[in-house]
Swiss-Prot record:
Its EC number is 2.7.7.6. Keywords: DNA-directed RNA polymerase, Nucleotidyltransferase, Transcription, Transferase. The keyword Protein transport does not apply. It comes from Listeria monocytogenes serotype 4a (strain HCC23). Belongs to the RNA polymerase subunit omega family. This is DNA-directed RNA polymerase subunit omega.
Length: 67
């Protein structure tokens, strides 16, 4: 079983495509900047997994710049 589940993540970000984009950008930032993350501990060892955990925890959100 994957954690967090895609269904739970889609409650935070409404589109699978947006979810992938946000997670990928955060994972890339964590990798390039050697960022340890905003959560005290992670279940995943990989950057994308950590980004998804941050989204699930509500620490990482998608900002909509529609005007």
């Amino acid at each position: 079983m994957l954690y967090p589940s895609i269904d739970n993540l889609l409650l935070k970000i409404d589109s699978k495509y947006s979810l992938v984009t946000v997670a990928a950008k955060r994972a890339r930032y964590m990798q390039l900047e050697n960022d340890k993350g905003v959560l005290p501990s992670y279940q995943s060892d990989k950057f994308v997994g950590k980004a998804l955990e941050e989204i699930h925890a509500g620490k990482l959100v998608l900002k909509n710049d529609d005007k």
